[in-house]
Amino acid sequence: VVGPHRVASFGPFARFGRSESGTRRDNPNLEASGNLQRVEFRSLTPDDADGSLRMSRDAFGVPIAGHAAFTLGQGIHRWGLFDGRILAAKTVDREYISVIGGRPVTTAGIAGVAVAPEYRSLGLARSIMTDTLARARARGAVISTLFRTAPALYRSLGYEQVAELVTAELPVSALAGLRVLPRIRLRRAEAADAPAMRAVYMQLAAEGSCLLSRTGPCFARSNAELVDAFDGVTLAIGESGSVDGYASWDRGEGYGPGAIFTVHDLLGLTSDAVASLLAMAASFGAVTPTVRLRTSGADPVHWLIPGAGWTATDVRQYLLRVVELVAAVEQRGWPASVSGVLQVSVQDQVCPWNTGNHRIVFDGGRAQVQPGTGSGVQMTPTGLALFLAGGGVTSAALRRAGMLAGGSPADDLLLDAAMAGPRPAILDYF
């Protein structure tokens, strides 16, 4: 750390900004272009808000109504590349926790990656991402995730798609015949119900793969704020009196053909809870003939909707990258039935500390990483991302994609067993 808002660049691929000695350096390739002499990588301050907002407008058309355009606070790390006093590129690293294999995995949620129009095609996006990943590792993140806008760039940086956040619409007629089931009672949520809602979500996250935990500073909401963020939250109460599911929803404006009833979360621990919450959404059909839902992964909602007409209106691809191989493999949970040793070799230019030979020992739902011999499989950083996320990806598929080479049939069998499990999902856009 050079000062309160200055940090050194990290690693051999920090081509811009400060050298490892902490002194600012020139980039001869940029000098030759005549457009840029030197850039500095540092954290953003409130004084940078105008430049950051201008860049966001250029890149994404924001600010979006109802969302803060520039926030600083616990759990949010904003970084920039500066050409003198001019902000040339920026990123945001949000402190998240992903749940993989039932265990928490510290995550850098990357967003707002942008380069000013006057500084594009100079490699600044790659440079700032490389430095941001190094800083994320320094604060303890072991994986990084993002919603892609430039797939070629992010794949070249070692990210690979593991999930999709899908927004879909369907006519209420597709829900015809659904009723609140006798074993379920619906009621409106109050602030006191927020812990039960969080418990429902966390159980589903533990049973899934890659969902965010919705804990930590970036999800710091009071019980009242959690419930009041929507027009309504409806609970599905089971026979024992437990909260078996909930739906958070917004009624929308007006009524008639163009009115839409939007469901943000529709989560249930039982089929009765899910079906009953769908029936609640259908009950608005006289005034809102269209229902909008958000889903991801193997959502049982798909299997409980009786009619036709489901149309995906927005699909956001979710990518993952392994930032710290050893810690990422050791933090996540693995199938309890998997036991064995896998020798893995990795070449990682963006996160060079991952490069090397690794011996992964699986036992009892956990894994340990030790120095390896190089006698097993070779895996690319993108292959490593898919390996860590799991979800039934197979070694054969990784080989066809050029992400896996070498090793033996026994290695492939062990890989397939380790990668078995729930399909990755994500329900939070950032």
Where are these regions (language model features)?
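Intrinsically disordered, low-complexity, positively biased terminal segments
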Residues: N29, G34-Q37, T45, R183-F430
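A structural microfeature
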Residues: A88-A89, A163, D244-G245
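Conserved acetyl-CoA-binding loop-helix of GNAT-fold acetyltransferases
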Residues: G112-V115, S121-A134, S271-A282
